[in-house]
A protein has these predicted regions:
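Fe-S-dependent hydro-lyases/dehydratases of central metabolism
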Residues: 1-541
Length: 541
């Protein structure tokens, strides 16, 4: 479990890694188990082998093109087959990392010889345990991708599934290129980008930056001369962090065009809602930086593109864990003082839902609203994360400037959403801020998995239109009424009346028994307090 939507990153080495909200992590650490609906398991059979200049990012782009940004909801994708065996761990990471963009619960590769090789490179081969699919095991669905048939792809604005071949994209001037991120910053990724750029220079009107994923990779890139190649080409290095993806480090100009190797290109995510963000592989990003418009490695290197296939991950990295802060022994940990600065305010705790709810619709959104839309993550907002009263003023800041004041003035309200509401980051502030502003429920056509969990944890009732057509019958600022709410929650079906339109419609609650208990308590904190009290009583008996 990880409090980050890209926790499935670890699926590349055979781990079942699931992204959840921070409250879920904290709850599990108290000893209360995490529960989730049993996902479907989809087999993805990979055949063939990637051609030089074609990155494993093309695999996940192809998946997104087929599955879409919401089609993976409730699924685990298991990558197997002869093609999977050809992919090194760093290549697999790109695929499992971006599986989150499909809405998937997680993605996973077998723990095979490629994983053994990776563990050996980290001095941990003795900890390797082979874990392969059982012979003849059954899946809930199957897909197939021939790696040999893939070509360089590009995700166009403003969704990661808006994928087409680079050869088909409209050529336009590019002002920024970013190489790196948690998706594509391995040794081989950066080395290949450097080889593409060797002997060339970044185009005159392009700013190109690079962020390497780890110190050990950075060190090796310097030793092997690849870092120098990038510097000679006019590339600037940034600090290793999530920053460049969310406008900390390099934000595009107004109506600018930026090409990035990261995993999301939501409108405004890079800091400027007027800009266009395109996603590509490191090889294509390097080529684009040189030409000044969308390009591939083969266009730059010609026959020499074959040299890219010679770059592999290292047999051994220099291991230096000196900067890792390790946990204290339990007895010492008890004495640790928690220091809270003046900008850290207590977390608001919602009340249990009332039995009769009358509230106006404070906001009606379009499809595919992301948690970035709800709570931005760039530099000017990140410093507010521990101060909910302050940060809530910027809730939906990039979507509706008046939302915060409107919701606050209403006292209590309801948000109506379209398909895939709350996609993207696991950012629980996207639930905390609306809760603080009095939002009692979200009624949508569909809700992204992690965000739905965060809504439950913070006492906001997630509801789904029983008939999606009812979305069109109601409007922002209509007053909705729900009678006998608590009893209806228990049945998982709620009848809602729009008092302004004089129409009635139904919504359903796709929640487990434990999630229902949490909602009826008013959120995870109240539920957890109750659970711990019960556990103490049992212990005394």
């Amino acid at each position: 479990m990880g409090g980050d939507s890209h926790t499935p990153h670890g699926g590349a080495i055979g781990m079942l890694c699931i992204g959840v909200g921070g409250m879920d992590i904290a709850t599990a650490m108290t000893g209360v188990p995490m529960r989730l609906k049993m996902p479907r398991v989809i087999k993805v059979n990979l055949t063939g082998e990637l051609r030089p200049g074609v990155n494993s990012k093309e695999v996940i782009f192809e998946m997104l093109r087929r599955v879409t940004i919401k089609g993976g909801l409730g699924n685990v994708y298991e990558y197997v087959g002869p093609g999977a065996k050809t992919l090194e761990v760093s290549q697999r990471v790109t695929i499992t990392n971006m599986g989150a963009e499909m809405g998937a619960t997680t993605s996973i590769f077998p723990a095979d010889e490629q994983v053994r090789k990776f563990m050996r490179s980290q001095g941990r081969e003795d900890e390797f345990v082979e874990m392969l699919p059982d012979e003849g095991c059954e899946y809930d669905g199957e897909m197939e991708i021939n790696l040999s048939e893939l070509e360089p792809l590009i995700a166009c604005p403003h969704q990661p599934d808006n994928v087409i071949p680079i050869s088909e994209v409209e050529k336009k001037p590019v002002q920024q290129v970013f190489i790196g991120s948690c998706t594509n910053a391995s040794y081989s990724d950066i080395a290949k980008a450097a080889l593409v750029m060797q002997g060339h220079h970044v185009a005159e009107n392009v700013s190109c930056t690079c962020a390497v994923s780890t110190k050990q990779i950075y060190r090796k890139l310097m030793e092997d001369g690849y870092a120098e190649m990038l510097l000679d080409a006019g590339v600037r290095f940034l600090e290793v962090a999530c920053g460049p993806c969310c406008a900390i480090g390099q934000s595009p100009a107004t109506k600018g065009v930026a090409v990035r190797t990261s995993n999301r290109n939501f409108k405004g995510r890079a800091g400027n809602p007027t800009a266009e963000i395109y996603l590509v592989s490191p090889e294509s990003a390097a080529a684009t930086a040189i030409v000044g418009t969308f390009a591939t490695a083969e266009e730059i290197m010609g026959e020499d593109v074959k040299k890219l296939a010679e770059i592999k991950e290292l047999e051994m990295f220099k291991i230096d864990d000196s900067m890792i802060i390790k946990p204290l022994p339990p007895e010492e940990a008890k004495e640790v003082e928690i220091r809270r600065g003046p900008n850290i305010a207590p977390l608001p705790v919602p009340d249990a839902p009332e039995d009769h709810l009358e509230a106006k619709i404070s906001l009606k959104t379009v499809d595919n609203i992301s948690t970035d839309d709800i709570t931005p993550a760039s530099a000017e907002f990140s410093s507010m994360r521990s101060n909910i009263p302050l940060m809530s003023k910027y809730c939906y800041h990039r979507y509706d400037l008046e939302f915060s004041e409107r919701a606050k003035s209403l006292g209590k309200s309801i948000i109506v959403g379209g398909e895939n509401y709350g996609q993207g980051s696991s950012r629980e502030h996207a639930a905390i801020n609306p809760m603080y502003l009095g939002v009692k429920a979200v009624i949508a056509k569909s809700i992204a998995r992690i965000h739905k969990g965060n809504l439950v944890n913070h006492g906001i009732i997630p509801m789904l239109f029983e008939d999606p057509a009812d979305y069109d019958k109601i409007d922002q600022m209509d007053e909705l009424e729900i009678e006998n709410l608590r009893e209806q929650i228990k049945t998982r079906e709620v009848v809602i009346k729009d008092k302004d339109k004089n129409v009635t419609f139904k919504a359903k609650l796709d929640l487990s028994d434990s999630e229902l208990e949490v909602i009826l308590c008013g959120g995870q904190l109240r539920y957890l307090k109750h659970q711990l009290e019960e556990m103490r009583k049992e212990a005394k008996q």
